[in-house]
């Protein structure tokens, strides 16, 4: 399972929310402003501007939005 974190602008945040709107899920964790779940990837956006992708499709989905600043794999 891969974990990837991007640092994104406010404009990209809006694009991400629109793109994954159909996959929206509610997350009540502190600092979370948006979350979505795909069959193979969880996506979490934070107030800090960080966007985290977790799961088998993390690399694929992160590549749509920007340069990876953190990457780690549990394998």
Task: Give residue ranges: language-model regions.
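Short Lys/Arg-enriched alpha/beta "domain-start" segment
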Residues: 1-41, 64, 68
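Intrinsically disordered, low-complexity regulatory segments enriched in Ser/Thr/Pro
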Residues: 43-60
């Amino acid at each position: 399972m891969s974990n990837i974190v991007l640092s994104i602008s406010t404009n990209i945040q809006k694009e991400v929310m629109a793109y994954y709107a159909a996959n929206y899920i509610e997350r009540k964790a502190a600092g979370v402003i948006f979350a979505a779940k795909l069959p193979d990837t969880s996506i979490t956006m934070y107030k800090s501007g960080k966007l985290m992708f977790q799961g088998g499709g993390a690399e694929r989905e992160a590549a749509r939005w920007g340069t990876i600043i953190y990457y780690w794999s549990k394998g």
